[in-house]
């Protein structure tokens, strides 16, 4: 028979971990000042008022390089545990990792051919 009392610690942890962030948001909403003056709405950088427009637009190339970096960084995060337990795992896991790497290679070749890695 399925006994719910075996999961009491789990339910207590779930309730507590849900209530604490909710309380933190509620308390900060009650205690935070509501009025926003001109000091709050102005840009602040190193104690100096900004001259001209404070917003700078970045070129899309920065985002493309960052996106490619994140993809390969996540690849490293996924492949590191596999590499550490390579001798324990079987051939099927090796084939799965090979397919994963091949998909990423195809994606990088596609990005390269589309010009995502060219700066000019």
UniProtKB/Swiss-Prot annotation:
Question: Broadest EC class?
Answer: translocase
Pfam families referenced in this protein's UniProt entry, alphabetically: Oxidored_q4 (PF00507)
How it assembles, according to the record, is: NDH is composed of at least 16 different subunits, 5 of which are encoded in the nucleus.
Please classify the protein's predominant subcellular localization into one broad category: plastid
* Entry-linked Gene3D superfamilies: NADH:ubiquinone/plastoquinone oxidoreductase, chain 3
- Which reactions are catalysed by this chain? a plastoquinone + NADH + (n+1) H(+)(in) = a plastoquinol + NAD(+) + n H(+)(out); a plastoquinone + NADPH + (n+1) H(+)(in) = a plastoquinol + NADP(+) + n H(+)(out)
Q: Which topology term describes how it sits in the membrane?
A: Multi-pass membrane protein
Q: Which PANTHER family match?
A: NADH-UBIQUINONE OXIDOREDUCTASE CHAIN 3
Main function: NDH shuttles electrons from NAD(P)H:plastoquinone, via FMN and iron-sulfur (Fe-S) centers, to quinones in the photosynthetic chain and possibly in a chloroplast respiratory chain. The immediate electron acceptor for the enzyme in this species is believed to be plastoquinone. Couples the redox reaction to proton translocation, and thus conserves the redox energy in a proton gradient.
Q: Where in the cell is it found?
A: Plastid, Chloroplast thylakoid membrane
Any one Gene Ontology cellular component term annotated for this protein = chloroplast thylakoid membrane
User: So which residues are the signal peptide here?
Assistant: none
Give the transmembrane region(s): 9-29, 64-84, 88-108
Q: Which organism is it from?
A: Buxus microphylla (Littleleaf boxwood)
- Cysteine disulfide links: none
Q: Which UniProt keywords apply?
A: Chloroplast, Membrane, NAD, NADP, Plastid, Plastoquinone, Quinone, Thylakoid, Translocase, Transmembrane, Transmembrane helix, Transport
For this entry, the protein name equals NAD(P)H-quinone oxidoreductase subunit 3, chloroplastic
Q: Which family does it belong to?
A: Belongs to the complex I subunit 3 family.
GO terms under biological process: photosynthesis, light reaction
Q: State the gene name recorded for this protein.
A: ndhC
